[in-house]
Amino acid sequence: MDMISYRLKEQELEEITKRLQEYKNSLLLDLVVLMDDGGRLVSFAPYVDSYKPIAQRVALVGAAVVGAVDQLEHVISSKKSMFFSGQEKNMYVHMLSHKFMLASVFNHKVPLGSVKLFKEKLSRELTTLLENALARGESRVVRFEDLAL
């Protein structure tokens, strides 16, 4: 079981999704995923049903990788982001706060510097919305079985 210590209002979730879509479109990214530290999908862009299973996997695996690397980094140094390079696509994962992460999946033609630059503006916008959700302090329990893979 896991505890969720935030609750997003419908209008906040719509605003988050809108901003993720704008970020995705501004850089021609393939996928943008906002997740929490428990691997739960908060929102994603493009917001199309066919992308939801992929976004859920990115959220779950992304949070696990960030958690594992975080434990290793206590030995070396502290970082707030990770970059993964594949044959055709790259992924940049950035910690927005101690609770939320943003993953950007993009083609090699998109410069990493542009992703980082545009991510800074998005991070500031999202952090305000997410801090409001955390401030409400509503906790609920989620069973692992409830997470759809």
Predicted regions and their residues:
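Acidic, low-complexity cytosolic segments
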Residues: 1-31, 38-149
